[in-house]
Structures are given as structure tokens and as C-alpha cells.
């Protein structure tokens, strides 16, 4: 099956059979979710668009959880493995997207890490927590069929980033999830749906 480079063309095709055929054609097993790191840290970033920030940070190796919310603007909270990434690498990814405003520190460790990695960026101390809202917007709105699959946090992060940036769908679904997705697609196709 030839890969489609034009995302708008992909979205116009009746996905009921196309996506299922692509999943069924794969013979490799899904990549197992990595074991949760023994120790994680949390970082909070203020930005212009939390949906973009969440999708961007979801592509950074070592990010294990993302949440979006509001605290005098839009924020993304990231739980990450400090053995794989740091605040500087995550901020660099956000700066490449053009959406990073400030690093928010709510404890002495976060403040020290911000000063260590982000000398040229604004670091704001906060006294209250953000009001968090439902995450993974791109996955939920562009691919509700995938969002309905009891995804692990790691699967949801990977698929949400893919939903935003496009490209080949990451092979993160288990065989059971692929089977369930196929049944969802068949039901939708029978009803005349294109999702």
C-alpha cells in the first residue's frame, strides 16, 4: 500500500477500509509499552497553545505523561524520565515549534532545574496548581475510533502526536486493540460512515 503524503487527501479517503487494511497488512507485533521509569520528574510549561505543546512534547523521548490546563494562560504538564530527557531538551522542542513562553516552577527542585537548563528563558514561580482539562485533543477529535480503544498513556501520547503532525501511524496498538479497531471500522462502514 503506497503511503499518502498529503494529509488532507488521507482525511478525505473513507478510512473504514483504508486504515484497517494498513493495520491488517502489518505482520510485526506492536511495540510493547516501555516499563514505567523508577523515578520521574514533573515540568510545567506556559505556551500559546497547549494542544501544540502536548503534541510536541509527546515526541520527546523520555516523556511518560502529559496533561494540559490553564494557569494565567495555557500550560502543559509533563511527567518525564530524567535519565532520558531534561527540561532543556523539552524547552528546545517547544521553541522549535515557536510556542514556548515560560517554565513554571512550583517547587525548589523545578526552580533549580529551570535555572540550570533555561538561563535564557523566563522562569515563573507559581503558588497554585493549574486547572487541568481533558487531554489528547488531536487524538480525540481526529481519530475518535482510536481514542475509544482503552489506550495506555504511552499509546495515547504517541497517537496524539501522530494525529497532530501526521506521517506513518506509529505501531503501538496491541493485536487485541487492532482487532477491536477493525470491528469498529466495519460497523462504521456498514452504517455508511467514513471514520
Describe each model-derived feature in a short phrase.
Residues 1-5:
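N-terminal secretory signal peptides that target proteins for export/translocation
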Residues 8-10, 57:
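N-terminal leader/presequence-like segments
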Residues 11-22:
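Bacterial N-terminal signal peptides
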Residues 22-195:
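Flexible coil/turn and secondary-structure edge motifs
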